Each structure stands twice: as C-alpha cells, then as structure tokens.
Amino acid sequence: MASVAQESAGSQRRLPPRHGALRGLLLLCLWLPSGRAALPPAAPLSELHAQLSGVEQLLEEFRRQLQQERPQEELELELRAGGGPQEDCPGPGSGGYSAMPDAIIRTKDSLAAGASFLRAPAAVRGWRQCVAACCSEPRCSVAVVELPRRPAPPAAVLGCYLFNCTARGRNVCKFALHSGYSSYSLSRAPDGAALATARASPRQEKDAPPLSKAGQDVVLHLPTDGVVLDGRESTDDHAIVQYEWALLQGDPSVDMKVPQSGTLKLSHLQEGTYTFQLTVTDTAGQRSSDNVSVTVLRAAYSTGGCLHTCSRYHFFCDDGCCIDITLACDGVQQCPDGSDEDFCQNLGLDRKMVTHTAASPALPRTTGPSEDAGGDSLVEKSQKATAPNKPPALSNTEKRNHSAFWGPESQIIPVMPDSSSSGKNRKEESYIFESKGDGGGGEHPAPETGAVLPLALGLAITALLLLMVACRLRLVKQKLKKARPITSEESDYLINGMYL
C-alpha cells in the first residue's frame, strides 16, 4: 500500500499546474453543495470522510483519463529515455529502473525491430520480484508486469515478462497504453562483470565489414533499350541497410533510376564505356565498394566481325557480310561498308523504285555459307519470264536483298537506264518493283509445300471417284447381260434338242 501511495503521489506531483487548478475547482464545486445543505455542527465525521473519498476517486479517474489522452509517441520517448523517478534495482544487479503504469510492450512490433523475449519467471508475487528478476538477468532491459484483476486474492500470482530491447546500440521496443499492465525500463551501468563477459566472447561482438558485389561487366550493342545492374548479391554478417550507386566514368547524360533497393536501371546509353560504383553500408556504419563497367558498342558488327550463317532473312552487305533484315534502312549504318543505308537512300515509297550499283570486279569476301539458293532461282525465273531482253542481271548480293525486301513473287519490270549515268568500273540500272501481295508479307517466303498437300488430296479424291464409277459401270453391264432376250437361233436349238 505504501508503494501504491508513493506512485499515486508521484503521479499527482507530475501533473501540470492546470491539472491542479482543475482539481481545486472540482473540490470547490463539491464543497459548495455540502455547505448549502446546512449540515448541523454535530454532523458525524464519517460523512465528511465519505465525501472526501468520493472526491479522491473522481480525481484519480480524471488523472487516468488525462494519462490515456497522452500521445503514444510521448509515452515511447519517456520509456526509452528512462523517464520517471529512477530507483535502484532490488536485489542483485546494478543500475536503476523507471516505472510507467498502464503501459504494455507492443510485442510483435518490438520483435520485428530487433528485440527479443527472454523468459517469463514463475511464482511472482509482486512487481518488485519481477523487477529483481530483470535486474539479475544480464540482457534484460524491460520488465512487463501483468497486474491481477480487482479485487485481487491475498496470494495472487502476477504475470512477469522479461525482454531485451537493446539492438544495434539503441532501444527498439515500442509501447502502448493498456490498463492492468505496468512496464519497468532498466538502465544499466557498465561493470566489471559485463566487461569481462565482453572480453571473454569477442567473436559475438565482432562485426565484419560488408562485401560489395556490383555484378559482372556488361557489353551492349546499339541500338539498346538499356540494362539493369544488380548489386543485391552483396553480403554482410548482420544486414545491409543502404545501397548507393555512383557514376565514375562515362557520359553524365545517362538516365539512372533505382527500381528496387540494390538495383540500378540505365537508359539513354551512348557509345562508350561507363564505370559505376556500388557502395553498401551495414548496420554498424561500415562501408564497402565495388565497380562494374558497361561497354556500349556502336553496332552489332562494330568490332569487325560478320555473321557466319546468312539466310534470306538477312541483308547482304556489299563486302560479303550480312546483318538482320530489320536493321537495314533504319538510319544507322550496320554494315562495315555502310551499304545497308546506301541501298535505301534512293528508295521511293510512292513508286518503290530502287537504284542499285553493280558489284565491283573484285571478288567479295566470303564469311559463311548461304542458304538462299531458292530465292535466287525465283528471282531469275521472274526476270526471264517478264524481261527476256533486259540488261545484264543483278549481282548475287543485290538479288538476295531484292528477294528479302520484296518477296519471291515480286515482278521486276525493266526501265530504261539514265543516260547521264557514268560507266566507270560500274553500271547503274533502275528497276521498278511491283509486288503482287501487300507490303507486309514480303519478309517471309511463300511456303513451297503449301500447294503439294491440296494437290495430293485432289488427286486421291479423283482416283477414288473414278474407281467408284468403273465399279458401277461394271455392275450395270452384268445386269444388262443377264436380262437380254433369247434370239430365234437359240430358240430353234432348244426345240430341236427336245425332240432329239
């Protein structure tokens, strides 16, 4: 009871001055009606004590309401700072504690922040016994006492819960107001036993620096949409709390975005070499860095190499290389000699007229086997059928590009060459391409096996019909033969046979 009285008095001492004024006003309001009642002088003192006890109950209820209206952040700051009167730990243990009535720990949030539950001592008869158990526990920093319901039995057992709220050198526990619970925060002073324990177990207190991994170097070819660098493979013995990316070398106009923690998305890359540095920071503030390079080449064949396997879906350069057909006529020279863009400079979209230059007398460089024999034969057949007296045929490279661009069913109509063209080591010829189908289907050749299957089915059905007709005619012929009337010669033969 003495301790409860001390706590009540301490809580009343902590009330602001305005609360004292409100208390006086409330006492005055309660005292005036009693004076107006004109009690006799010989009124028993028991009635006065009853009125005073009622006033005290009202004040206590008013104090609790004011305490419940306090912000939760103020309560947490007071508990973390060890607010309230400091008292020495009862029993063994050093340090002091501060009490906060009607406060309970938010277990789930505190454990998620790094706190840990130690134990729940049994057979606790008072809050001092719970605080003493926390003081005797080296890692205990908060003790939560669950008070019994009123009226409490004489030997009621209290609930006692011990927590370690210290993580990464600070208090991480969170609290909330709740009647029926009291929390006690311990503040320990370093003693010789703690220092000896720390020296005896240096491995537990050691925090190694993090290991930064920015990933492997990247090589890209223009045009490109960008790349994503991933540094989430960085490791630490505790945890990594921050990732920082920095551009050390390269065009500063590159667009750098962080879609997720530890990653970096790059866009608007230009030709050249970029160097990026990843710096990671762990929970102890230790840092580690690693570099990664991003090399952006001019084009897919800017290194001088050529595609080794060429097909009708590729554009054949004048020097013998081949590139993807979609890279031609895109405004960027992909061929080493730039013939992919020279081929399309005189391309008229309204007349579809292309001016080609015949190959030079020098033999082109061979880089790989060609798979476009079918495309060449189709172009040659169409040229022979439509222009028997046309000028000299195009080179193999030009014919392949024509076949890839305009399709195997295109017709080539010769046009008279320009008289102003020069004939020095080369001949210029003009052709107008008129595709039978729409322009969208010129990139893929017509399948040759598509007409074989319908033809085979037609022949099979025709043969079956002919067989059925032949069988039908044979049956009709046999029926007609059986139903033929007897001739005169046959009747005479039968009659003579009867008399013989």
UniProtKB/Swiss-Prot annotation:
Keywords, in A-Z order: Disulfide bond, Glycoprotein, Membrane, Phosphoprotein, Receptor, Signal, Transmembrane, Transmembrane helix
Ranges for domain LDL-receptor class A: 309-345
Residues in the signal sequence: 1-37
Keyword Transmembrane attributed: yes
Annotated GO biological process: multicellular organismal response to stress; response to cold; response to heat; response to immobilization stress; response to mechanical stimulus; response to starvation; response to water deprivation
Keyword match Transcription regulation: no
Region listing for Disordered, in residue ranges: 358-445
One GO cellular component, as annotated: plasma membrane
Protein name, as recorded: Low-density lipoprotein receptor-related protein 11
Organism expressing this protein natively: Homo sapiens (Human)
